[in-house]
Amino acid sequence: MRIEEEIKLDYSDVLFRPKRSTLKSRKEVDLIRKYQFRHSKLIWQGIPIIASNMDGVGEIEVAKKLASYKLLTALTKQHEIKDIKNIASIKKFNNSIALSSGTSRVSYERLNKIIAKYPHFQFICIDV
């Protein structure tokens, strides 16, 4: 016999709990949400899922595809300004993309250059 001593979690230990639904089918589910940010008063509407700013995930082609489904992408911080120029010209993507920056002075200056050139991007991801 093996005795398991580690903590076991159940529904009383989680923040999200299932609740009764009046929906007849999963097709009726609407994932789109509308948020108003407390300090900027910016309103964003979409599906609140963000693709990470990891290599291979936070790429421009991924951002374009996910934006068509109203999902967000945090671009990797390695993108050059010329790469961002290609997506900045497509206005429908601007509220679906977060520009990424590290915490170094160089990263901060790079982010400021991008924002100065393309001020219509609304979101920033700070990679620590």
Regions found by a protein language model. Give the residues of each.
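Active-site entrance/lid segments in N-terminal catalytic domains of soluble metabolic enzymes
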Residues: M1-V128
